[in-house]
């Protein structure tokens, strides 16, 4: 039985995701599928539109057999940390044969070549990088030019400017870094770019679907999302459990910033940026507006988003030094095939499986990372329009299909 691993967010699940899942199963000829999925906060540096249990329902209805949560410290980090945490978790299961991910390039050889150079940093690459950095350009641009020089490929700029290619390269780097035996596959992305905000083409991006939901609701999305996604979203919204956006947390974030809560413990914060964020918090009450005030050529919106989410969730950069990947397997949901795989994982994986959250202290010698997930849920539910209690992780049942 071949087992396929995929790394997902399903924010929300749409027809492009369905295409990737079905094509991946056909390409790899795997009979079983495991998804490592971001929880209530996602890699863009924002809350998911609906919670992790609703998105687990979508995944299982689409044909995923087992859904495992990617710890929030990795789910909300840089592409490099996100990929490393997710790949390390899949590898730690000790049953996964293949991994499949989307990319705009769709060419594994080209992406692998780039991944190997970035991981190994051969002397000729380091020399070229140093030369370009001396000219005063940003690190990202210097890296791009250095790669272009050593690989002699004019498409490098195009490859490194699209988010799925960047993640694909990071997945390949992580597989190589940990010496994983998992075989990688890539599916060429179809339809709109990941960042596109327009509903168009055969497959719309998750960003454009979320934008439509916030502005116009669910009507008009039938062409882009499966019926089950629409039903799950509709049910959530009727219960006033979403749609959730970063703006819901504006007051908390502005309070923390005006109170000058230190930012220097957060990943990717420099002194100049810290002061700029503090100053901007006195000019607006809205977090989206704050990001526009801080954003510049030097400080990207993505970087600012991640800093704000880590401030909101109190994620310290030290945690990445304390852990080498996730130290537990948090199960969110499964079907009968997923139950079979859990039995195999229990036999083979060195990591504890957590299905009953109340037992986490007995199962984990270091609870710090897991408790960040619990805290993230408690913060996330503050955005619900109904009265929501804390501790949802302890009382929400596993999703079973």
Swiss-Prot record:
User: What compartments host this protein?
Assistant: Cytoplasm
Q: Which NCBIfam families match?
A: PRK13670.1
Q: What is its main location?
A: cytoplasm
Name of protein? tRNA(Met) cytidine acetate ligase
User: Which InterPro entries does the entry link to?
Assistant: Rossmann-like_a/b/a_fold, tRNA(Met)_cyd_acetate_ligase
Organism of provenance: Thermoanaerobacter sp. (strain X514)
Q: What is its EC number?
A: 6.3.4.-
Family stated for the protein in its record: Belongs to the TmcAL family.
């Amino acid at each position: 039985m071949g087992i396929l691993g995929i790394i997902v967010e399903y924010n929300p699940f749409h027809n492009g995701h369905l295409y990737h899942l079905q094509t991946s199963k056909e390409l790899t000829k795997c009979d079983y599928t495991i998804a490592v999925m971001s929880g209530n906060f996602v890699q863009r540096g924002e809350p998911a539109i609906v919670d992790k249990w609703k998105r687990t329902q979508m995944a299982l209805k689409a044909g995923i057999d087992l859904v495992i949560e990617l710890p929030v410290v990795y789910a909300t980090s840089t592409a490099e940390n996100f990929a490393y945490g997710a790949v390390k978790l899949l590898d730690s299961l000790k049953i996964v044969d293949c991994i499949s991910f989307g990319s705009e390039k769709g060419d594994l050889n080209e992406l692998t070549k780039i991944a190997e150079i970035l991981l190994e940093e051969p002397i000729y690459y380091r020399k070229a990088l140093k030369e370009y950095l001396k000219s005063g350009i940003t690190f990202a641009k210097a890296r791009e030019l250095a790669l272009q020089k050593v690989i002699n490929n004019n498409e490098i700029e195009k490859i490194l400017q699209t988010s799925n290619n960047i993640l694909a390269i990071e997945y390949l780097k992580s597989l190589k870094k940990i010496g994983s035996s998992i075989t990688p596959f890539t599916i060429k992305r179809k339809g709109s770019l990941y960042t596109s905000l327009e509903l168009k083409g055969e497959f719309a991006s998750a960003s454009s679907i979320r934008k439509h939901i916030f502005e116009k609701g669910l009507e008009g999305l039938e062409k882009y999302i499966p019926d089950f996604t629409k039903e799950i979203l509709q049910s959530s919204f009727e219960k006033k459990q979403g749609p959730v956006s970063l703006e819901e947390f504006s007051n908390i974030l502005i309070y923390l910033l005006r109170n000058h809560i230190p930012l220097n413990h957060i990943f990717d914060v420099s002194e100049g940026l810290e002061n700029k964020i503090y100053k901007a918090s006195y000019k607006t009450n809205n977090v989206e507006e704050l990001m526009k005030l801080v954003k510049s050529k030097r400080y990207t919106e993505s970087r600012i988003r991640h800093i704000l989410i880590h401030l909101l969730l109190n994620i310290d950069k030290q945690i990445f030094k304390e852990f080498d990947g996730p130290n537990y397997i948090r199960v969110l949901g499964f079907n009968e095939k997923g139950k079979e795989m859990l039995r195999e994982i229990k036999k083979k994986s060195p990591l504890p499986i957590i299905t009953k959250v109340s037992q986490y202290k007995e199962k984990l010698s270091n609870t710090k990372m897991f408790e960040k997930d619990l805290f993230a849920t408690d913060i996330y539910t503050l955005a619900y329009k109904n009265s929501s209690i804390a501790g949802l992780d302890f009382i929400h049942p596993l999703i079973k299909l």
